[in-house]
Amino acid sequence: MFHHISVMLNETIDYLNVKENGVYIDCTLGGAGHALYLLNQLNDDGRLIAIDQDQTAIDNAKEVLKDHLHKVTFVHSNFRELTQILKDLNIEKVDGIYYDLGVSSPQLDIPERGFSYHHDATLDMRMDQTQELTAYEIVNNWSYEALVKIFYRYGEEKFSKQIARRIEAHREQQPITTTLELVDIIKEGIPAKARRKGGHPAKRVFQALRIAVNDELSAFEDSIEQAIELVKVDGRISVITFHSLEDRLCKQVFQEYEKGPEVPRGLPVIPEAYTPKLKRVNRKPITATEEDLDDNNRARSAKLRVAEILK
């Protein structure tokens, strides 16, 4: 059974200004904590579309949400398919959309999934167990240059080249098959002094591999741009991010749509086409409370950004 503590649960949903008969999308169902909190505020005319690319999460969520199943439509898909999902459901616009971009605790804690650098498992890291690309494929078959690129770009790992060289040397002897085997190789590529600070030495490379396997940043960028077009006027979008790459991307997209296109000089009245599409509800991201941190240490890096649609 999934046991997952949702980060900033109240804030994420409360900032949506939930209407009891509204239609909402949970883009990252996970352990269904946010979904349950939202569903408790909807009447029987309200509806939640719950998306997850992990079928196991959906199966478990059905148990968590068993008292509200008549109000939920479950969709096994990637949230980058948002427009198509709504089209298939004959829904044009919704009242609010929210994202929790953290890996759910069960995915981290079930060793077989291969997300954790604390447990030994095969190198997998797929959110969607039906897709082909795995961490094993990347680690053993991608070029040295490609490894350096993803470790640096997605993990912000300053020892990317050294780690990629060690991986290259090891896989020439035999395939690298398990998470703890990879952890030992990563440690070889990081100077002893640097290993003693900044958290677990494998943290950044594992993050980079997870993002690459699941194409996370590209999928989120595709999805959030669709979300902005799919939410009704006065509706809101809430996004919880867990690392600087996601947060920066979310901030940039919201800023871009808040600014709107550049207005030609000399116009007596600004046409609607040049007015902002949205406004940021909070200029600075909301961070986890002490209470959140007591419940869930993973909340330490969480940031919540909210936007309201204007047209």
UniProtKB/Swiss-Prot annotation:
The family line of this record is: Belongs to the methyltransferase superfamily. RsmH family.
Source organism per entry reads: Staphylococcus aureus (strain NCTC 8325 / PS 47)
Source species, domain of life: Bacteria
Checking InterPro entries in the record gives: RsmH (IPR002903), SAM-dep_MeTrfase_MraW_recog (IPR023397), SAM-dependent_MTases_sf (IPR029063)
- Catalytic activity line of the entry: cytidine(1402) in 16S rRNA + S-adenosyl-L-methionine = N(4)-methylcytidine(1402) in 16S rRNA + S-adenosyl-L-homocysteine + H(+)
PANTHER family listed in its UniProt record? 12S RRNA N4-METHYLCYTIDINE METHYLTRANSFERASE (PTHR11265:SF0), S-ADENOSYL-METHYLTRANSFERASE MRAW (PTHR11265)
Would the keyword Ion transport turn up in this protein's UniProt record?
no
Its biological function?
Specifically methylates the N4 position of cytidine in position 1402 (C1402) of 16S rRNA.
Keywords assigned: Cytoplasm, Methyltransferase, rRNA processing, S-adenosyl-L-methionine, Transferase
Signal sequence: where? none
One GO molecular function term of this record is: rRNA (cytosine-N4-)-methyltransferase activity
Q: What gene does the UniProt entry assign to this protein?
A: rsmH
**Subcellular location field:** Cytoplasm
**One GO term of the biological process aspect:** rRNA base methylation
Which parts form a coiled-coil structure per UniProt? none
Q: Name one GO cellular component term.
A: cytoplasm
**Where is S-adenosyl-L-methionine bound in this sequence?**
32-34, 52, 79, 100, 107
Q: What is this protein called?
A: Ribosomal RNA small subunit methyltransferase H
The record ties this protein, via Pfam families, to: Methyltransf_5 (PF01795)
EC number annotated for this UniProt entry:
2.1.1.199
